[in-house]
């Protein structure tokens, strides 16, 4: 696509946006600690029981999701980053619902990198253009069922383009067993285990209390589990932003 065509697409393509914020650090997964601007889209095809971003998921909050052109989104990213290239995290909800290919192309043309996390339920051809793709299938505690064919479709769509990682949120033994099975199914993917936050915020209260002690107890349990099982390829990482700021939004 020529630069002129990209500019036209940027003006004409509309994305539902829940919030854009940063720069801050990526709080979880393989890019943890990396300076990042977040573009959070609105809408999701899942309803996980412990979702911590219901304001970007529940259709009750649809009126707060702002339809924005790619050009308008990009101007916000540029303003937040001061025009200095960094990583842009595309999140949600499920960002795979939205038409993000034009945004990725525009940003990469200016030296920015793009990462996306999704549950792996919807494959898009523009996955191949990402720099990082984190596939985070939802374990039994979420109340959702995993469509492994759709997950494999996401891997196929990504091809050899982005660095791909597997991340699973863990609350209990059933989730742990699910993560081990998923890792065995896709042994070529680096795997990250994240202790679940059992005190996620209500969508209208980002100051809700977090049981940090409970989350850290779960993390210690996870460390002990992988050590006992000799699962030495797994990495256990917390949600760093939760440890720093609790359930506060926009950080």
UniProtKB/Swiss-Prot annotation:
It is an enzyme of class 4 (lyase). Pathway: Purine metabolism; 7-cyano-7-deazaguanine biosynthesis. Its cofactor is [4Fe-4S] cluster; S-adenosyl-L-methionine; Mg(2+). Mg(2+) binds at residue 53. Disulfide bonds: none annotated. Residues 31-247 form the Radical SAM core domain. It catalyses: 6-carboxy-5,6,7,8-tetrahydropterin + H(+) = 7-carboxy-7-deazaguanine + NH4(+). [4Fe-4S] cluster binds at residues 44, 48, 51. S-adenosyl-L-methionine binds at residues 93, 136-138. GO terms for biological process: queuosine biosynthetic process. GO terms for molecular function: 4 iron, 4 sulfur cluster binding; carbon-nitrogen lyase activity; magnesium ion binding; S-adenosyl-L-methionine binding. Binds 1 [4Fe-4S] cluster. The cluster is coordinated with 3 cysteines and an exchangeable S-adenosyl-L-methionine. Keywords: 4Fe-4S, Iron, Iron-sulfur, Lyase, Magnesium, Metal-binding, Queuosine biosynthesis, S-adenosyl-L-methionine. The keyword S-adenosyl-L-methionine applies. Substrate binds at residues 25-27, 40, 91. Catalyzes the complex heterocyclic radical-mediated conversion of 6-carboxy-5,6,7,8-tetrahydropterin (CPH4) to 7-carboxy-7-deazaguanine (CDG), a step common to the biosynthetic pathways of all 7-deazapurine-containing compounds. Belongs to the radical SAM superfamily. 7-carboxy-7-deazaguanine synthase family. Homodimer. This is 7-carboxy-7-deazaguanine synthase.
